[in-house]
Amino acid sequence: MPTHNSHSQPSSEDEGPPQSIIFGDHKLPEHPPTPNSPLQQTTNPFILESDGPHRQPHQSTIYSPGPFREPSTSRSPSHSRSRSTSPANSPGHSTISALASQSGVTASAGLGMTGADTAAASSKPTFREVPVPLSPTALSRQTSKSPAKSPRMGKGEGYLDPTILSVASGSRNSGKGKERTRRKGGHKYHSLHVQDEEEEEPPESDALRTRGKVGLNAYEKALWKWVNVDDLDGFLQEVYDYYKGKGIYCIVLARVLNLLTTFFVIAFSTFLISCIDYSKLFSSISTAEAVGRLEDVLVAQCITKGSFAHTLFLIILSAFFIFQVASFAMSVPRLLDMYRFYTHLLGVPDADIQTLPWPEIVRLIGDIRKHNPVTSLSNGQATALADMVGNDAKAPAKKLDAHDIANRILRQENYLIALFNKDLLDLRVRIPVPHVLTAFIPSSILISSADAPLPSLQSEPERKFLSFGANHLTKALEWNLRFCLLGYLFDRRGQVRKEFVREKRRKDLVQGLRRRFIFMGILNAIFAPFIILYLLIYSFFRYFEEYHKNPSSIGSRQYTPYAQWKFREFNELPHLFERRLDRSYEIAKEYVDQFPKERTALVMRFVAFIAGSFAAVLLVASLIDPDLFLHFEITPHRTVLFYLGVFGSILAISRGMVPQENMVFDPEASLNEVVRWTHYLPVEWRGQLHSQMVHQEFSKLFALKIMIFFSELLSVILTPFILFFSLPPCAAAIIDFFREFTVHVDGVGYVCSFAVFDFARYGNVDANQPETGLEGATGPDGGPAADGFAAGKPSRPTTRRTTSSSPSRLKHRDWRGNENKMEQSFLHFKATHPDWQPSDPSSSLFLDRLMGAGTRNRHGGGPVSAATGGISGSIYGGGGGGVGGRGLGVDGSVMAEMEEERLRAKRQSYERAWAKSSHLHRPDSSHSHPLRHPHSAASEIIEEEEGGEGDKGDDSIDGWSKRVKTDGETDDEEERERLWKDEGVVGLLQQVLGR
């Protein structure tokens, strides 16, 4: 098979290479090339040649050989690289596409061919450049030329086969100076076989031409969407939302039904409030001439005759409904893109999304990134060409593993998890009290600034606050926190603003955050009446059927929103977190119900007996005489049917509050099982699991649904006070947290430091020295590390511990998460994604030492106590909480007996290791930060294994190196001033509407 290799070097006369390229390794056609094969050239792929008198009767679609092809036999010197369109055949998974194909372009314009050339080259593009629309001058120049007969395509296996110059042209131009210059680049191009024009046309050519006129097929659209992703965070978020929504049909159905529900609530509430004359209705019922038709009590033109408040309420709800409809219509194209991405690129049909585990989706996405690395984000903000043919051409493509995907999807949620874990948000109701009124208010509900939990509050002058309620969170308050905090920290692309990691902007950022809190407090106070009315109507329609069908459900419980944020772990996706909590509901309800409630049980038994007696008598009487059921009135206008419903509801509620007679009382064992799933065990609870204090605190986290509902209604009134008075003093601590706990990860960007799983700085990689990190870091002279360096190694760029400007704010900062949150998150993430291998040596060292400690304990037969926060619920747990196969529970997966035994043994070793690691050594309270919870003095130290200390504290490891800011780095003053100027009320309102 004759081929020709040409080495070319781009010169100053040539255009630069394209920003996006594609290549493939498909098989070449069987026909050998002809020496006189002409080079084909097309017009812009997005401009179709108009019909004209010179158009040949038989013309087929022409496919360009690629942007780096040098024409061999061309009459005009202006012939150069052609802009290509894609072929007909869909590429395989190894194909890399930077631009989807555009077919249907005629070959009549600009094709220079000799008269003796009767054969046409069948070319498949090797490289393709983003098409640039032709100018009118260039278009007229091309259309003015005499069109030549179009060659016909040869049959090939794929559309990414490489091409080169023909042998004849290559030998003829080998001595040219321009060709010698190009030969220095080392780029290799391979020729394609051609097919004679007189040969029989392949049978699929008609289909190719027809499809080319239509446009891209579904696979090419999905591939084009993937390689042109410019916001990988947003794209992965859409991928996860599509997976969580169970496919396009479930998502569309859910959103349509949600729109219909909103419309029904608005329309039906308007009808009930404005369109019925209740005076006629009740008067007709009380008289003998009862009205029996609905039209007798209807109000004519009820909507136009309504009051101003009702009209305003209706306008606001209608605008909200129209906004939801518009949002749904705008989301349909993105849903179709996700459908094509899952179906054609991942190979996951819509019916299998509901049963496929998320780790398998992550693996498929990683395979696509491995086979198709050329995207708009191949190297951060660099172009795809720099990745493939630049200085890093020999470097492997950056991987996209489960950890990277989770950090991108949960980039914002990880900060909220850390804020709740560090207890930096004061969510209590705090109202300032004038000094003249402090003598008339009980001191139990008054606090002073000296008693405030945050340092910023302690520095304020003496002032009394009326405070009631504990830290609680509602959906309304959570939405406001997302807007005020995350909308302030992140830009429109979901990336952390660089100003937050620089201390020189601290004062402006604190003032800006305080203004956002105050503004949202005022805005919530204005719209509070409308929000309460809508919540009342919606909740009545939603919960009435549930409570009417099952009255005992009024005593059911669920975790509060505040408890969910306390339980959630770093890099834990919402559906995995919900599955973990769902497994704890039954045992949590058992723990709460079995606790001694003798007085309540005695009263409820009496109430159940009385209500059951009345209900039994009425039911027996109705069976004897059925007319009594509907016509006998016990009280005026109240029949037997009404009182049967009343006494039946009382009986069901009272029975639900009476514990079962055969229940075994063991609260400590029950709470241990709850901790197994929630992974939440404060230090204050340890050793007190049987006490009433722990029961009361857990009951606040696992509250009655009816109480949560009333809290949501009450929060509409209290949220303005929390935003206006409680949260503004926390602004300084929040801004400091954003700066101190933000790190830069190569290829991912700025993320929360706890989500990186950097045990050398924020965790317990060394069991004998658990408090690693900046508190224990020393400089070369044995003193404390300063200016972001510890022991000669680069530290976090956003922290300067011993500068004169901030001598005490960062000196005693607790760099570790409370309750070993990061360690638990790492172990659970590893269990959920078994195929993931941590790239950080400190993470691997932590895992190896835990497994080693568990192995020693297993051989020694040491007991494992679930009270220490055991991880059996998430690390290979046998009760469905483990991970078998691809993230499924062991009990729910079909595995061999040997695999089950291996996982069971690993589970036991991890449990024993966790039993020892949960009692990690902590420093005394005198060196802790005021925000930190007090820890028990008793601690247990894991026996340290030999070696493994060389990697401790290294911040530049396998792509997770921290970005160090140099002293000479400057900022763009114009952009900075534009970003941080006071936008005023109008700007904040625009941001609220944008959310």
UniProtKB/Swiss-Prot annotation:
Subcellular location: Preautophagosomal structure membrane; Cytoplasmic vesicle membrane; Golgi apparatus membrane; Endoplasmic reticulum membrane
Keyword Transcription part of the UniProt annotation: no
Lumenal side: 277-311, 627-638
Segments in the Cytoplasmic topological domain: 1-255, 333-516, 538-605, 660-705, 727-995
Highest taxon of the lineage: Eukaryota
Intramembrane region residues: 517-537, 706-726
Polar residues biased stretches: 1-11, 92-106, 137-147
Catalysis: reaction(s): a 1,2-diacyl-sn-glycero-3-phosphocholine(in) = a 1,2-diacyl-sn-glycero-3-phosphocholine(out); a 1,2-diacyl-sn-glycero-3-phospho-L-serine(in) = a 1,2-diacyl-sn-glycero-3-phospho-L-serine(out); a 1,2-diacyl-sn-glycero-3-phosphoethanolamine(in) = a 1,2-diacyl-sn-glycero-3-phosphoethanolamine(out); a 1,2-diacyl-sn-glycero-3-phospho-(1D-myo-inositol-3-phosphate)(in) = a 1,2-diacyl-sn-glycero-3-phospho-(1D-myo-inositol-3-phosphate)(out)
Regions crossing the membrane: 256-276, 312-332, 606-626, 639-659
GO cellular component terms, A-Z: autophagosome; cytoplasmic vesicle membrane; endoplasmic reticulum membrane; Golgi membrane; phagophore assembly site; phagophore assembly site membrane
Free-text description of this protein's post-translational modifications in UniProt: Phosphorylated by ATG1. ATG1 phosphorylation is required for preautophagosome elongation.
Membrane topology note: Multi-pass membrane protein
One BP annotation, GO: reticulophagy
Compositionally skewed regions (Basic residues) per UniProt: 179-191
Alphabetical keyword list: Autophagy, Cytoplasmic vesicle, Endoplasmic reticulum, Golgi apparatus, Lipid transport, Membrane, Phosphoprotein, Transmembrane, Transmembrane helix, Transport
Disordered as annotated region, ranges: 1-208, 771-817, 914-978
Biased composition (Low complexity): 69-91, 783-808
Positions with biased composition (Basic and acidic residues): 949-968
Domain comment in the entry: Forms a homotrimer with a solvated central pore, which is connected laterally to the cytosol through the cavity within each protomer. Acts as a lipid scramblase that uses its central pore to function: the central pore opens laterally to accommodate lipid headgroups, thereby enabling lipid flipping and redistribution of lipids added to the outer leaflet of ATG9-containing vesicles, thereby enabling growth into autophagosomes.
Function: Phospholipid scramblase involved in autophagy and cytoplasm to vacuole transport (Cvt) vesicle formation. Cycles between the preautophagosomal structure/phagophore assembly site (PAS) and the cytoplasmic vesicle pool and supplies membrane for the growing autophagosome. Lipid scramblase activity plays a key role in preautophagosomal structure/phagophore assembly by distributing the phospholipids that arrive through ATG2 from the cytoplasmic to the luminal leaflet of the bilayer, thereby driving autophagosomal membrane expansion. Required for mitophagy.
Assigned protein family: Belongs to the ATG9 family.
Assembly description: Homotrimer; forms a homotrimer with a central pore that forms a path between the two membrane leaflets.
Protein name as catalogued: Autophagy-related protein 9
